[in-house]
Amino acid sequence: MAEENQTTPADAAQAAQGPQFAIQRIYTKDISFETPNSPAIFQKEWKPEVQLDLDTRSALIEENVYEIVLAVTVTAMLGEETAFLCEVQQAGIFAIGEMPEQNKAHMLGSFCPNTLFPYARETISNLVNRGTFPPLNLAPVNFDAIFAAYMQKRAAQQAQEQAPTQLDA
């Protein structure tokens, strides 16, 4: 006789109350692409120095629903001249149910930006291509490491602020 997988109402209620996560929407919030030194920049040998800057922010928009914005700025320089400057704000609306604050902070600061990054990377690649520059393939970003470094820095700052001050006698 085959075993049946039965779920009791108590099991279902417990599962429903566990941590929950859902992506409600992913969208591009803002885009900018500049080629301040065109068309002269197209005549130069293409050996750029590429700088990648990342920033994230989150905002509670209603109970347990957050907007996360991942801002990605890519600057390509040829010597002292800017070949292009590409800025993308990739955003998402995420429903994050009740969970411990540490877990929620990780979701907001690492998991959600990690979800958004491939969309931003694709948008940047398309913009660079439309600017007629050689392909730009951004490497994956370790948002877990970035978030861990941020949390360590924040903990060190809080410890420093709470440290008792010594007075010289």
UniProtKB/Swiss-Prot annotation:
Lineage: Bacteria, Pseudomonadati, Pseudomonadota, Gammaproteobacteria, Alteromonadales
Complexes and interactors: Homotetramer, a dimer of dimers. One homotetramer interacts with 1 SecA dimer.
InterPro entries membership: SecB, SecB-like_sf
Family: Belongs to the SecB family.
Full protein name: Protein-export protein SecB
Alphabetical list of Pfam families matching this protein: SecB
GO CC aspect terms: cytoplasm
Location, primary (coarse class): cytoplasm
Record keywords, A-Z: Chaperone, Cytoplasm, Protein transport, Translocation, Transport
Domain of life from the UniProt record: Bacteria
Organism (species): Pseudoalteromonas atlantica (strain T6c / ATCC BAA-1087)
Compartment(s) of residence: Cytoplasm
GO biological process: protein folding; protein tetramerization; protein transport
Transmembrane segments: none
Function according to Swiss-Prot or TrEMBL: One of the proteins required for the normal export of preproteins out of the cell cytoplasm. It is a molecular chaperone that binds to a subset of precursor proteins, maintaining them in a translocation-competent state. It also specifically binds to its receptor SecA.
UniProt GO molecular function: unfolded protein binding
Gene, per the UniProt record: secB
